[in-house]
Amino acid sequence: MFQGEVPDGYALVFPFEEAANRTIHMLFVRVPLDVLWLVDDEVTKVETLRPWTGIAHGLADTVVELPSGAADGVEAGDTVEIVA
């Protein structure tokens, strides 16, 4: 929140115990973000959210926030490997 930019290669990962409807909002976020909703490492939804007003929901056991444009070409059904 309140960051003016998101560094290249940055990802914020939110793991959850089980798959459920997860809501992401952009209140107080100043830059657009690409968001991936994953279930068992499979993408269920991809969306670019706008600063301040964006909101979206999706089924996920993991949610990944990325710099805008980082998820270009990623589609529902793709597999994502999280490497820490």
Where are these regions (language model features)?
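Compact, glycine-rich, soluble single-domain proteins
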Residues: 1-84
